[in-house]
Amino acid sequence: MFKRIALVCALFSGICFAEGKQLLDKVVAIVNDNVITSSELNAQVELSKKQIIAQNMQMPDESVLRKQVLQHLIDVDLEMQMAKQNGITIENAEIDEAIEKIAASNHLNLSQMRDEITKQGISWQEYRQNIRKEMLISRVQQKAVGKDIIVTNEQVEQYLKNAGRIENSNLTYHLKNIVIPLSEEPTTKQLQRAKIEAENLLNKIKKGEDFSRLAIEESSGEFALEGGDLGERHLAELPEVFAKEVVHMKVGQVAGPIRAGNGFHLIKLVAVGGENQRHVITQTHVRHILLKPDASMVPSEAIKQVNNIYRQIQSGKDFALMAKQYSLDAASAVKGGDLGWVNPGELVPEFEKTMNSLPLHKVSKPVKTQYGWHLIEVIARRQKDDSEAFKKQQVRQFLQQRKFVEAVQNWQQHLRSQAYINIVDKDLA
């Protein structure tokens, strides 16, 4: 995204000229050996304005918005630099797949998706580049901190035990957030200054100033340009210091300043969601016969044999006997191919898709998966209340997300502390 321009040119004038003294672009900031130009800043400011209008938020002062957007671009550039250093790339096919999923989740086809993007004043190429950037940043964050995120069974059980003592622990909480940042190792003066700044913002909010506008203008949080909107979160997803507050807050109330690792926070409770409903799943009792190429059977022979077995079963041969005689899945073959009761998501997608489409007691045509060729028969289906297991899995995911967010914030803080950042345009400093 960012253009590389000779540092000497940027340092002395902030403006670079081509051979004919033609103006190229103005440098507004230097981030290590990268630069951010005024055209890049202007484009992102315009995009942010459109988002603010679309979300019906108060528009902040132009100069304040430009400063905030520049800080966002600096953070993005630092992470993009880390992605490059680590050799992380995103293939076009991966972008295509991501866009298809986004379109499907919005009940649009690709043509409709293009139209919607164009209506927002964004070219399709720009949109693809933004998706690429988001995927790169997500991947570099995972590489930087993901391997260290571990949630044990004991932590899940302890959370559930503690949550049982907290009223409304099963609810979801829609929050907005303002972050006044701190360095990795703040001095006493820096702590006092940040806390006073947070208290001053809290007083402004109490006097009627708009929380979202102040978040855009003052917050250093990841969602500052979205008005500090964190969206709807389960209690387990929130930092513990937030969770302790929100269960006692009323909708519309603002709490803080709250001290966390990356700074002082103000949080606003926008809405409270309903309790999680019962989670019921469809279990399937299924059996299969597996044929796969090996040293004694080339692929063409495997296909020929599985089709032959299919024809024999269609002619009345017993599925279980054929499984015992021919299936190469040793564990299930001795049981007549019986896999027992399986839950959604336990089997490979190609197998599960065919299984779910089968009527009871009808044998599928040969199905190819990574393991070989399968013949599948559904023996029975039943509904099961999976609420307890589902709740534990949700809590595990929420705790992982909480740890991940906190680790990413600390990593971003460290990136900034180690970087050379020079805001050349002093109006933006």
Swiss-Prot record:
Signal peptide positions (record): 1-18
BP terms from Gene Ontology: Gram-negative-bacterium-type cell outer membrane assembly; protein folding; protein stabilization
GO cellular component terms listed in the entry, alphabetical order: outer membrane-bounded periplasmic space
Main location per the UniProt record: periplasm
Domain PpiC: 170-271, 281-380
Enzyme Commission (EC) number: 5.2.1.8
Any one GO molecular-function label of the UniProt entry: peptide binding
Record keywords, A-Z: Chaperone, Isomerase, Periplasm, Repeat, Rotamase, Signal
Catalysed reactions listed for this entry: [protein]-peptidylproline (omega=180) = [protein]-peptidylproline (omega=0)
UniProt xrefs under Pfam families: Rotamase, Rotamase_3, SurA_N
Localization per Swiss-Prot or TrEMBL: Periplasm
PROSITE patterns per record: PPIC_PPIASE_2
Comment, domains: The PPIase activity resides only in the second parvulin domain. The N-terminal region and the C-terminal tail are necessary and sufficient for the chaperone activity of SurA. The PPIase activity is dispensable for SurA to function as a chaperone. The N-terminal region and the C-terminal tail are also required for porin recognition.
PANTHER family named among the record's database cross-references: CHAPERONE SURA
Main function: Chaperone involved in the correct folding and assembly of outer membrane proteins. Recognizes specific patterns of aromatic residues and the orientation of their side chains, which are found more frequently in integral outer membrane proteins. May act in both early periplasmic and late outer membrane-associated steps of protein maturation.
Protein name, UniProt field: Chaperone SurA
Lineage of source species: Bacteria, Pseudomonadati, Pseudomonadota, Gammaproteobacteria, Legionellales
